[in-house]
C-alpha cells in the first residue's frame, strides 16, 4: 500500500524530546524591528569566518540604528549599511566566500528522499536545510524559506556580514553556492515577510 503522507500536526505530535535540541545562546542573533523581535540561529559549522565576523559586528554595535534597506516580494528582506559608510573594525569588511564546506562523517546529515534539481542529495544538517554532493564530497546550506544569508556585490569576497538578508518567498535555490548562507530564522519570519514591499529601483 502507498505510504501515508503525514500532516505537519501529525509529525509534531509523533516527536519525542530526543527529536529536539536546545538553541545555542552563542549562536543566537536577535533583530529588533518595530513590529517585534526576529530570532535567528547562526551556522558556524558551515560559515565559521562569517559567523565570527557577524558576532564581532554585533559586539561593536555595528547594526544599531541601521535600516531594512530592501524588501522584495517573494524574495528577500535585507538590512545593513548599503553604502558601506559605517566603520567595521575590528570586524573585516571583506571575507573569502564560504559557499560550501568539505563533507564527511563528522557532518550530521538527515537525508530526504525527495528528488532535487539543484543537488544530488538534500536534507538537514544540524536542523539547517542542506545539500551534499557525494562525487565532490562537498556540502552546503540551501536557500529555503527563512534562510539567513550574507549580502554581497559582484565580487565573491565582497560579503562579510555587514549586510544580511532573509528569504521571505519561494526558495531561490539558484543562489546556492553563489552566496554565503550563515543561518536561519527560528521565530518571527512572519514579521519580515509582512513588511511593506519596496518601490525603488533595484
What is each residue range found by the language model?
Residues 1-202:
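Cyclophilin-like peptidyl-prolyl cis-trans isomerases
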Amino acid at each position: 500500500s502507498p505510504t501515508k503522507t503525514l500532516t505537519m500536526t501529525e509529525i509534531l505530535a509523533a516527536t519525542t524530546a530526543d527529536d529536539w535540541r536546545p538553541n545555542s545562546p552563542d549562536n543566537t542573533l536577535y533583530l529588533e524591528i518595530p513590529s517585534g523581535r526576529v530570532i535567528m540561529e547562526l551556522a558556524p559549522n558551515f560559515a565559521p569566518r562569517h559567523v565570527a565576523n557577524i558576532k564581532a559586528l554585533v559586539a561593536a554595535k555595528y547594526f544599531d540604528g541601521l535600516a531594512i534597506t530592501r524588501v522584495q516580494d517573494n524574495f528577500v528582506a535585507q538590512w545593513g549599511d548599503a553604502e558601506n559608510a559605517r566603520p567595521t573594525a575590528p570586524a573585516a569588511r571583506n571575507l573569502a566566500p564560504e559557499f560550501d564546506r568539505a563533507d564527511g562523517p563528522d557532518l550530521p546529515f538527515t537525508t530526504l528522499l525527495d528528488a532535487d534539481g539543484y543537488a544530488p542529495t538534500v536534507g538537514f544538517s544540524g536542523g539547517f536545510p542542506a545539500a551534499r554532493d557525494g562525487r565532490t564530497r562537498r556540502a552546503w546550506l540551501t536557500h529555503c524559506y527563512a534562510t539567513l544569508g550574507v549580502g554581497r556585490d559582484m565580487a565573491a569576497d565582497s560579503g562579510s556580514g555587514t549586510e544580511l538578508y532573509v528569504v521571505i518567498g519561494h526558495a531561490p535555490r539558484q543562489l546556492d553556492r553563489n552566496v554565503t548562507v550563515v543561518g536561519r530564522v527560528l521565530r518571527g519570519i512572519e514579521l519580515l515577510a509582512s513588511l511593506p514591499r519596496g518601490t525603488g529601483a533595484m
